[in-house]
Design a protein with these regions (language model features):
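Flexible "arm" and connector segments at domain edges
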Residues: 1-70, 74-108
């Protein structure tokens, strides 16, 4: 499933890890227990996205590497949102308001 529906699945997985005490060894759960570490990972991954994009535009990197770094950023951003109790749907609503799109029903 290589489309936006996977984001809902990713969000569900992050919530499941948060709510499952037996998942204590899960990387996601470790990040949720250490919000400062999760925030640092967002900053780190954002920098890596910028570096990969710069390298790609200079012909020194690949689209695949940029996509990999972007995926890491999205994952870590979702973890930060989950730790703060902010659902992706709240972010989607802000984006839709900014771009004048009608709200979609049933977004996570």
């Amino acid at each position: 499933m290589a489309d936006e529906r996977f984001l809902a699945q990713l969000w569900s997985t992050i919530q499941a890890r948060r709510d499952d005490p037996s998942a204590e060894r899960s990387y996601t759960r470790q990040l949720l227990a250490a919000p400062a570490k999760a925030r640092r990972k967002v900053v780190e991954e954002a920098y890596e996205v910028a570096e990969a994009q710069q390298g790609l535009l200079a012909g020194q990197d690949t689209r695949e590497h940029l996509a990999l770094e972007a995926a890491d950023l999205v994952y870590h951003l979702f973890v930060v949102l989950a730790s703060a109790g902010v659902a992706p749907g709240e972010v989607y609503e802000v984006l839709e308001r900014r771009h004048g799109a009608p709200p979609r029903a049933g977004t996570p």
